[in-house]
Amino acid sequence: FARQVRIGNGLDRVDMGPLAARRELERYLKVLEQAKTEGGRVLAGGGRPAGLKRGWFADATVLGDVPPGAAIMNNEPVGPVAPVCRVRDFNEAITLANRSRYGLGATIYTLDLEESMRAVRELEAGMVWVNAPLLDNDAGPFGGRKQSGLGRQLGAEGLDSFRHTKLAMIDYAARPHDFWWFPYADAESFPGSRGGTK
């Protein structure tokens, strides 16, 4: 699949455009090099696309055999790369995914409904996709957990981030009340006080 991604100018019929800036491309290529020195094996991509020397283009990349402790498995690479490592079982997959300090989104592929619901429940991510990566709905919230951003965009939760909730309590009688001040047991509204309850 990664080899079929058409890369180029976003005004053309392509699947993926360039990274945002030269420094982002340089940073991303360093991330890939570090992943390779830590044991990752390039299965597809791994550099810059042939024929696109001008611009900040990078290959869609798949890395295999990446050790769970590699930096790319624990940091956001912010680039077109899928680092892959083998796990013993579902429990280990959840544990490894959750140990990252980031939690924007997670994708799981399974035909087991119980397993998919457990992943949705246990993955520490703002969004979880099951068998449908990056399927989107503008009525739903977009955002991460941990160090993957603050708040939510889109949906009711996104609108809430533009509101400021305020509590205002007004007593139009404007007479002093003593029930918030010490000694509380002597307050006029305290149950069992001389004045009874109001």
Predicted regions and their residues:
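General beta-strand structural signal in soluble alpha/beta enzymes
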Residues: 42-45, 130-132
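Short, solvent-exposed loop/turn elements at beta->coil junctions and helix N-caps
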Residues: 46-52
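Short linear capping/connector segments at secondary-structure termini
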Residues: 11-17
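Short beta-strand to alpha-helix junction loop
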Residues: 19-29
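Active-site region of PLP-dependent enzymes
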Residues: 5-11, 22
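Helical element adjacent to the flavin cofactor pocket in flavoenzyme catalytic cores
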Residues: 31-36
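Short beta-strand segments
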Residues: 20, 43-45, 108
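Conserved C-terminal structural/oligomerization subdomain of aldehyde/semialdehyde dehydrogenase
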Residues: 1-3, 37, 50, 57-198
